[in-house]
């Protein structure tokens, strides 16, 4: 199923306007959630404050399961941002898809491998940055690529490449597959008679609910693996 997207060319580089739009929408939604949930903070949290504190505690648990809080506390905001951004991005394309003149404008940005691989490269880049910053270049390089044995260096390089690919493509594959199946179901419903169409709505809603679950799980997995990779780079025992 070939899809077309609106693009704009700058300096010979094509930019996907759909991705730009959806990433912007995702950022705005996450920002609004953060602002709304942190307004008028109370000592005894209720409602929306409970939600944001639950997210913070959830990410804290992810970090504590991979490294001590003294080391990992600085990545708390990163984890919260990744979890919320990816979850919201995964949800945007589930209710509907908008296409104008056969060009798709509205869908989940994480259904594009360029977006997910960019996220993965950013995350792996941060792990290297903090590894060097916290351990020093020599200690980091030797400990990461030549430990426990020097002949493992080529395999360590392959591992870095594989981690980037799997982190990005896992997220893309799950979200893209979910949206493709929802599109197929919606197309089939449009060609059914009213009675059969009403009955077919039930499995469509069930699949949409399952897709929400998958989107949440993928946001968790991406955040968890980010902290796993980070702990490998910044902790001496790894």
UniProtKB/Swiss-Prot annotation:
Gene3D superfamilies listed in its UniProt record: ATP synthase, F0 complex, subunit A
Record-annotated disulphide pairs: none
Domain of life, source organism: Bacteria
CDD domains xrefs: ATP-synt_Fo_a_6
Membrane topology summary: Multi-pass membrane protein
Record GO biological process: proton motive force-driven plasma membrane ATP synthesis
Pfam families the UniProt entry points to: ATP-synt_A
Localisation per UniProt entry: Cell membrane
GO CC annotation, single: plasma membrane
Family of the protein in this entry: Belongs to the ATPase A chain family.
Free-text function comment from the UniProt entry: Key component of the proton channel; it plays a direct role in the translocation of protons across the membrane.
The name this protein goes by in its record: ATP synthase subunit a
Organism per entry: Listeria monocytogenes serotype 4b (strain CLIP80459)
Encoding gene, per UniProt annotation: atpB
């Amino acid at each position: 199923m070939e899809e077309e997207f609106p693009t704009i060319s700058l300096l010979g580089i094509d930019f996907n306007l759909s991705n730009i739009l959806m990433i912007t929408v995702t950022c705005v939604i996450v920002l609004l959630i953060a602002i709304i949930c942190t307004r008028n903070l109370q000592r005894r949290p209720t409602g929306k404050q409970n939600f944001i504190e639950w997210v913070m505690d959830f990410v804290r648990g992810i970090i504590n399961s991979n490294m001590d809080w003294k080391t990992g506390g600085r990545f708390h905001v990163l984890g919260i941002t990744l979890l919320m951004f990816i979850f919201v991005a995964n949800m945007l394309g589930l209710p509907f898809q908008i296409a104008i003149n056969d060009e798709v404008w509205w869908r989940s940005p994480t259904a594009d491998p360029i977006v997910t691989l960019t996220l993965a490269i950013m995350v792996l880049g941060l792990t290297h940055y903090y590894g060097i910053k916290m351990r020093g270049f020599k200690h980091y390089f030797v400990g990461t690529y030549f430990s426990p044995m020097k002949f493992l260096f080529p395999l360590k390089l392959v591992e870095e490449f594989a981690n980037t690919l799997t982190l990005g493509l896992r997220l893309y594959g799950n979200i893209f597959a979910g949206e493709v199946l929802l599109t197929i179901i919606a197309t089939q419903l449009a060609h059914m008679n009213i009675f059969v169409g009403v009955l077919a709505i039930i499995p469509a809603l069930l699949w949409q609910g399952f897709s929400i679950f998958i989107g949440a799980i993928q946001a968790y997995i991406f955040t968890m693996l980010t902290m796993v990779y980070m702990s490998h780079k910044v902790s001496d025992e790894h």
